[in-house]
């Protein structure tokens, strides 16, 4: 039963949600800072933190698992060679979400920025 099991659907099918998370995660890893709606970034945060924890292990199985979650070789290379060593001494909490003013001319969406903690 699905009692009290909640997740954001973003008016998308399951495949579209997976594609959205992969796309946002790829952009965050490559550019290290992205702007989007607050709800999307709150859903993205655990996905990216799981990838960084995998990258900190650094073995072949972790690399293959990360490639299955995020099939982009350039992003995985940066994740394992640049980001994982940066967060070696940190146990979680690799990202920060900073709220921005709402989008005024359109739908008044709550915007935010997600970035890596230095």
UniProtKB/Swiss-Prot annotation:
Family: Belongs to the bacterial ribosomal protein bL17 family.
This protein's UniProt keywords: Ribonucleoprotein, Ribosomal protein
One GO CC annotation: cytosolic large ribosomal subunit
Name of this protein: Large ribosomal subunit protein bL17
Disulfide bonds: none
Gene that encodes it: rplQ
SUBUNIT field: Part of the 50S ribosomal subunit. Contacts protein L32.
Single GO MF annotation: structural constituent of ribosome
TM region(s), chain numbering: none
Superkingdom per UniProt: Bacteria
GO biological process, one term: translation
InterPro entries for this protein: Ribosomal_bL17, Ribosomal_bL17_sf
Organism per entry: Hydrogenobaculum sp. (strain Y04AAS1)
Taxonomic classification: Bacteria, Pseudomonadati, Aquificota, Aquificia, Aquificales
């Amino acid at each position: 039963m699905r009692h009290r099991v909640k997740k954001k659907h973003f008016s998308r099918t399951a495949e579209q949600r997976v594609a959205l998370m992969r796309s946002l995660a790829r952009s965050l890893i490559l550019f290290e800072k992205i702007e989007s709606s607050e709800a999307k970034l709150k859903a993205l945060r655990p996905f990216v933190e799981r990838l960084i924890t995998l990258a900190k292990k650094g073995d072949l199985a972790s690399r293959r698992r990360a490639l299955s979650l995020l099939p982009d070789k350039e992003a995985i290379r940066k994740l394992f060679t640049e980001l994982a060593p940066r967060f070696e001494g940190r146990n979680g909490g690799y990202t920060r979400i900073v709220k921005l003013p709402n989008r005024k001319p359109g739908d008044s969406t709550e915007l935010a920025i997600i970035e890596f903690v230095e």
